[in-house]
Amino acid sequence: MRRNLTPFFFLLPALTLMVPFVIYPVFKTIYLSFFLGDKFVGLENYKNVLLSPDIVNLERFPTKSPPWGALIHNIVWIAIHLPTTIFLGLGFALLLRKKEVKGSSIIKSIIFLGMVIPMVVGGLIIRFLFEEGAGVIPAFFKLIGIEKLAITWTAYPQTALFSVILGSIWIWTGFSMLMYSAGLASIPKDYYEAALIDGANKFQIFRFVIWPLLRPITVVIVAMTLLWDLKIFDIVYVATGGGPGGASMVLALQMWDYFARSLNYNYAAVVAVLLTALTFIPALWLIKRRG
């Protein structure tokens, strides 16, 4: 009996920390989501939050400029950010995998820099890059004669959301590049040599040799990117604050807004529960695929 209980004694320190800091807050958040003040309202809070233009604004989406609602902003973020970072990460990994490429290590370090710096610093960099008169992006559009985009992107509803999405692509591309670089390094050279002997060209080698072997890594990258896109907070908070007028508001920031600005703890709890449920989808998908 004592031997059977030994593992539980080793778990006690972790459980002692998890109960007050993880388990209790989770159940307390779920509890608050069903109340309005001290009154039990069931699913009424969920109905009000999901129908709120703060979360989904179908009157403006997709015919008008943002704000479209925090949930739609997250979906747009995923639709742009996920495929772009995978494509760029894979592209850079393929181009820089050979040691013969001059400066490949330096280029990789620059690309991966976005993952190393704190997200708060990343948000400040994004705000600076898209600032009129100082940023690289407005200066570029002014140089090529597109004056409409030579503005402070974070200050206008039409461009604020896309400025933080584009900035986050630089931040996250380093992660996918690093993962794909590790995957490419693990592929034996014999596979390439066998394909060349069989008369395969570069595209066929990528399609039938490289890509199938990189699929498990791609699953991990997709799941991790989805989780990051859903819980994104800090760079948006620093770069735009969710503005102007909620044009770049995302779910995690909307949750904070309900909690800290509106002092509506019940609505904040609802968004927290919804956000947790959404993050479970890629997490469970990853576990299933890896299993």
From Swiss-Prot:
Pfam families: BPD_transp_1. It is found in: Cell membrane. It comes from the Archaea. Keywords: Cell membrane, Membrane, Transmembrane, Transmembrane helix, Transport. GO terms for biological process: transmembrane transport. Probably part of a binding-protein-dependent transport system PH1036/38/39. Probably responsible for the translocation of the substrate across the membrane. This is Probable ABC transporter permease protein PH1038.
